[in-house]
UniProtKB/Swiss-Prot annotation:
Residues reported to bind 5-phospho-alpha-D-ribose 1-diphosphate: R78, R103, D130, P131, M132, L133, A134, T135, G136, G137, S138, D199
Enzyme Commission number, as recorded: 2.4.2.9
Residues that, per the record, bind uracil: I193, G198, D199, A200
Pathway: Pyrimidine metabolism; UMP biosynthesis via salvage pathway; UMP from uracil: step 1/1
GO biological process: UMP salvage; uracil salvage
Keyword vocabulary terms for this entry: Allosteric enzyme, Glycosyltransferase, GTP-binding, Magnesium, Nucleotide-binding, Transferase
Family to which the UniProt record says this protein belongs: Belongs to the UPRTase family.
Keyword Magnesium on entry: yes
Protein name (record): Uracil phosphoribosyltransferase
Amino acid sequence: MNITIVDHPLVQHKLGLLREADTSTMKFRQLTQELARLLAYEATRDFELESVTIDGWCGKIDVKQIKGKKVTVVPILRAGIGMLDGVLDLVPSAKISVVGLARNEETLEPVSYFEKFVGNLDERIAIIIDPMLATGGSLVATIDLLKRNGCKHIKAVVMVAAPEGVKIVNDAHPDVQIYAASLDSHLNEHGYIIPGLGDAGDKIFGTKQA
């Protein structure tokens, strides 16, 4: 499977706290941002650098900077918004693209209702963020949209993934690397990840869970 599990002690500790059933909205939101920051750190590890000359306090010096166009972060609405601030803490100059996809609870297929992409996607690295990679439909649809708009370099950062969803994404887009805190056991009959986190969107936004 084309997936990187970030097995850092801080990542695993925060994931464990997120899994608690009685975690408050405030705490869940805070932990989501913290975990997103740590996962994004790993996802940006292979960014290409270039040397540039700057004016330092002691004169001109050579330093390293990320080469080429900056990143676009792509939250999948609505739950992906909960991870956005954590990623922007690391790459504050990143442009933000947005994809709105809702899951049909009967067919489990994604339905697009909003798309807004920044310019020059062909020159940017896109980092898709979504707390859960369950069936894989939303992630595949988002990657499809990005590629259709010219994006060539795409990564996906999720907190928890199911094997079924990872396979769907790998089969459709083998060039896209997935980063996750955990590869969980399976999907249940309703398409939810087991053990998972529950409904991450409801927990982040404080809305009623079914």
